[in-house]
Amino acid sequence: MRALEVSEINAQIKSILESTFMDICVRGEISNVTIHTSGHIYLTLKDESSSVRCVMFKGNARNLKIKLEVGQSVLIMGSLSVYVPKGEYQILCKSITLAGLGELSQAYEALKTKLGAKGYFESAHKKPLPRFPKRIALLTSATGAAKEDMLKVAHKRWNLVHITLFNTLVQGEGAKDSIVENLKRADSFFGTSESFDVIVLGRGGGSMEDMWAFNEECVADAIYSARTPIISAVGHEVDVFISDFVADVRAPTPSAAMEILLPDKNEYLRVLDEIMNSYFYALKQQFVLKSQALERMREYFKLYNFEQRYCAKVEQINIFQQMMRDSMNAVLEDKMLKYEHIFLSLNARCEEKLQQCQYEYERMLEVFNALNPHSLSTRGYAQISKEGKPCRLSDIDINEEFYLSDMTHSILAKRLQ
């Protein structure tokens, strides 16, 4: 058997290890960690009985999403590398995540797929935000920095809004139940005089475990069932949670939620100032133009002696009015004379006609009196009647009875011949 040099055995070990362990996943606890000024990260990963050195170069370190601390339990994805001169090996880290995040990521993706199939993310279900909200329900921790950030931004942008804080657990045991309970409480005012225009669900950043309540199905159900528009403002811009997909609007940060929701009063004041300045400028321009037009008209009047011509026209009108009055008086006098003549003529004819009617009346009265039955009876005349009807003597047969009547008496008679 040929004896191998140390460098040869180390080289063979390097070849075997690096070709065999090209893609590995190792779980362990960080025992120490150093971030070099070059951007490289050096750490030691250990378990109860062993340890191994690890390095993450600058290129991969830029994509690291967690802050590495001693005592953290992590999962490292990478490959083995052997340093031949010293016969040492280490893990070249491609990614480092907190242990347990693999299971959480799988649960996250499974719930996301399930809710997507149920239509929880459909844009048709999204409710629009009010343009000028008056009442906001804020669901966050009363002691968290997120609350202070949101209130500060809200006061700066639109201090007319009324914000009601629902103190909510946003991490740890009971967080999901607290979120669901307060969502339902805030939404229960919908349709009343104390209803909220929008609900803001917010908290600052943190680890996936800390933020997991916003990936719970019961929270998604409560958001989807709410009648009040909801903004999900959870974590940082790079963090995306199930609540972000289900909510009507997703804000990248809690502060951004208030910027999205509330108008900027300073911007509105600036626009108002621009409108007022534009209005006054236009008014000033109109005033200048009208003043110039008035001055031109004044000069025009002077040029054509409008004042003298106006006075002459007034004098002509006065003369014409006098002529009209004189003419009307003459016509009126002529008409009055004609009327008086007609009246006298008509009066004479009426008197003549009245006398003629009086004469006719007296003549007819004499005839009437002569034919009056009472007058005839006084002269011995009587009326003949048969069966209650007046008749002539020639209408009565021989031996037929009839009545003779005057104004006071009536007797039965018989024709004898």
Curated annotation (Swiss-Prot):
Gene Ontology cellular component list: cytoplasm; exodeoxyribonuclease VII complex
Stored InterPro entries: Exonuc_VII_L, Exonuc_VII_lsu_C, OB-fold_nuc-bd_dom
Catalytic activity: Exonucleolytic cleavage in either 5'- to 3'- or 3'- to 5'-direction to yield nucleoside 5'-phosphates
Keyword presence, Nuclease: yes
Enzyme class: hydrolase
Pfam families the record matches: Exonuc_VII_L, tRNA_anti_2
Keywords: Cytoplasm, Exonuclease, Hydrolase, Nuclease
Subcellular location: Cytoplasm
GO MF annotations, alphabetized: exodeoxyribonuclease VII activity; nucleic acid binding
Transmembrane segments annotated in the record for this chain: none
GO annotation terms (biological process): DNA catabolic process
Entry protein name: Exodeoxyribonuclease 7 large subunit
